[in-house]
């Protein structure tokens, strides 16, 4: 089993010479459309550290975009995967089923919000889960249209690109896109507050604004679903004002519109709850999950009320690899680890550690326009000094400097001015503090 010392160590520049040679091979074999944030080639990873081919150890504050939530190569996952691979690796569940798939769906039906009878279906990726949630919603309502939100990200397939708000790099040049997609304004407290202070704090008011746009653009009679990330991911870790999600859900319930929660990035303890919609006390009709579900193995799911999930005809849902038994074994071990090791509570601790530090930084630096997020999903919105104008150039400089110092951080946001922190929940306090020290020092240097 992988054992990686939980400390940062730089023995070469980042990236090192071996990584640079491998990057040449990458560029000769992989199309340029597959962009790479930091070309250090990984050999081992565990806890909060990634080790590269040059022997450097980097602090991981990205978790592979919120995937290795319980830490890379988590012991229970390694044991479960080894055992499953030794038994069988694939049969195709829709041809000859197996217990592992059923066990995962049982667990999802148990842990997702809501106490009624539920059903779950498994896929390979978040985008595939989102696509299928729309299929289910359309099948149940017999209506075509879907509403997504400003700043949304839902994937890179044709339909999910249509749902995604940001053009470059996700959509530019790839159209035409799926029809019957409409867009509504999100509750974005930081930027809403620049225009209307009430919008920043009153989620019901922000919800009414969104509903007004929805009713004018498409109307309930043709609307199958509203899909929303309870906390936006790629859009900038935007946490809507309290009451926004509940207002939307109430409108959906009154109008036979499915409320779909895209919890691909927020699910599985990432935000200090098993699912982010729990913070708002809402129960979606359908919930999409992926990323943190299986500690790095490809798995995704759609879970929802049984009557809704049973709407598609027999063989209307499925796929060759969806619910692969090895990925299912990893998912079962992941859920056990979250629940047995107190990782929901750990995410809450990480939130306090990060936000306390970042809020102190904000007090001393007016380029930090906003600090937001929940759990181990925290963002810093960088702006030009004395303004609220996004500063993507500073954001890129900070990220590049962090990488060179051995700290993996990610950027995001419609304007490219968000530093996002997504550490694994198993990172030590000391390692997290070191990463934040480095981030603080870099901001001071610029």
Swiss-Prot record:
Keyword annotations: Aminotransferase, Pyridoxal phosphate, Transferase
Principal EC category: transferase
Superkingdom of origin: Bacteria
Cofactor needs: pyridoxal 5'-phosphate
InterPro entries recorded: 4NH2But_aminotransferase_bac, Aminotrans_3, Aminotrans_3_PPA_site, Class-III_PLP-dep_AT, PyrdxlP-dep_Trfase, PyrdxlP-dep_Trfase_major, PyrdxlP-dep_Trfase_small
GO biological process, one term: gamma-aminobutyric acid catabolic process
Alphabetized GO MF terms: (S)-3-amino-2-methylpropionate transaminase activity; 4-aminobutyrate:2-oxoglutarate transaminase activity; identical protein binding; pyridoxal phosphate binding
One protein family per Pfam: Aminotran_3
CDD domains the record matches: OAT_like
UniProt pathway: Amino-acid degradation; 4-aminobutanoate degradation
Reactions accelerated catalytically: 4-aminobutanoate + 2-oxoglutarate = succinate semialdehyde + L-glutamate; (S)-3-amino-2-methylpropanoate + 2-oxoglutarate = 2-methyl-3-oxopropanoate + L-glutamate
SUPFAM superfamilies recorded: PLP-dependent transferases
Modified residues (N6-(pyridoxal phosphate)lysine): 291
Gene3D superfamilies: Aspartate Aminotransferase, domain 1, Type I PLP-dependent aspartate aminotransferase-like (Major domain)
EC number: 2.6.1.19, 2.6.1.22
Keyword Transferase (UniProt): yes
PANTHER family assigned: AMINOTRANSFERASE CLASS III
Family the entry assigns: Belongs to the class-III pyridoxal-phosphate-dependent aminotransferase family.
Name under which the protein is recorded: 4-aminobutyrate aminotransferase
Organism for this UniProt entry: Mycobacterium leprae (strain TN)
């Amino acid at each position: 089993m992988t054992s990686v010392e939980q400390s940062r160590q730089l023995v070469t520049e980042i990236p090192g010479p071996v990584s640079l040679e491998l990057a040449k091979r990458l560029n000769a074999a992989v199309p340029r459309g597959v962009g790479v944030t930091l070309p250090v080639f990984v050999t081992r990873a565990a806890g909060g550290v990634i080790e590269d081919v040059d022997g450097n150890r980097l602090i991981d504050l990205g978790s592979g975009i919120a995937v290795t939530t319980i830490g890379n190569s988590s012991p229970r996952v390694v044991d479960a995967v080894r055992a499953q691979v030794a038994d069988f690796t694939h049969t195709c569940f829709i041809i000859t089923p197996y217990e592992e798939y059923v066990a995962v769906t049982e667990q999802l039906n148990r842990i997702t919000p809501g106490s009624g009878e539920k059903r779950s279906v498994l896929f390979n990726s978040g985008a595939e889960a989102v696509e299928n949630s729309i299929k289910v919603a359309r099948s149940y309502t017999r209506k075509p249209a879907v509403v997504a939100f400003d700043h949304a990200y839902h994937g890179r397939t044709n339909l999910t690109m249509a749902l995604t708000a940001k053009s470059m790099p996700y959509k530019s040049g790839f159209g035409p896109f799926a029809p019957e997609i409409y867009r509504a304004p999100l509750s974005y407290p930081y930027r809403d507050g620049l225009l209307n202070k009430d919008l920043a704090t009153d989620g019901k008011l922000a919800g009414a604004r969104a509903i007004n746009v929805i009713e004018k653009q498409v109307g309930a009679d043709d609307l199958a679903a509203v899909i929303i990330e309870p906390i936006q991911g790629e859009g900038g870790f935007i946490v809507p004002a309290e009451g926004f999600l509940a207002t939307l859900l109430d409108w959906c319930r009154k109008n036979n519109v499915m409320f779909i929660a895209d919890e691909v990035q927020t699910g599985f303890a990432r935000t200090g709850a098993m699912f982010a919609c729990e913070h708002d006390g809402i129960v979606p009709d359908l919930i999409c999950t992926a990323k943190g579900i299986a500690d790095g193995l490809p798995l995704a799911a759609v879970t929802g009320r049984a009557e809704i999930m049973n709407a598609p005809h027999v063989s209307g849902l499925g796929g060759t690899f969806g619910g692969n038994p090895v990925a299912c074994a990893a998912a079962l071990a992941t859920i056990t680890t979250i629940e047995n090791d107190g990782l929901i509570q750990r995410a809450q601790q990480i939130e306090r550690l990060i936000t306390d530090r970042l809020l102190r930084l904000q007090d001393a630096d007016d380029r930090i326009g906003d600090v937001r997020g929940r759990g181990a999903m925290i963002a810093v919105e960088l702006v030009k000094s004395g303004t609220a104008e996004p500063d993507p150039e500073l954001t890129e400089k900070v990220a590049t400097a962090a990488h060179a110092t051995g700290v993996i951080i990610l950027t995001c946001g419609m304007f490219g001015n968000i530093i996002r922190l997504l550490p694994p929940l198993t990172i030590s306090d000391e390692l997290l503090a070191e990463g934040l020290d480095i981030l603080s020092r870099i901001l001071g240097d610029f």
